[in-house]
Amino acid sequence: MKNIEKYRNLIAKGEVDALLLTSKHNRMYAAEYCVAEGVSVICKEESYYFTDFRYIEAAQKNLPGFTVVMTDADHPYTKLINDAIAAHTVKTLGFEDDSLTVEEYTLYNTKLNAVLHPYSAEINAPRQSKEP
């Protein structure tokens, strides 16, 4: 099973509509590739990876199964995340409450058009067991 499917299985439980992955460890696990900077949103049917111009080419080349979108001054992470969650009617967004700073949480909580649901334990769980 691809790692991204493990995260989709979490969404299928019905506690959240999508996942917001901000930590490098979980972004790398979901994508099965390391992009130095970015944010990922995992929805039931589609996965998004948002990054800036420095990493966009590598992300587009190495993240099959993700819709890769470039951030810039006119298209900050919060706007792009809102576009993605609106396209999938996301009301509740599970996030990594153990790794966001207060500043990041405040930004996402005030700018995103979804209720943030602390979900670190569930998001981290797939990384805790190795597959052969």
Regions picked out by a protein language model, each given a short descriptive name:
Residues 1-83:
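N-terminal accessory/capping or targeting/presequence segment of soluble
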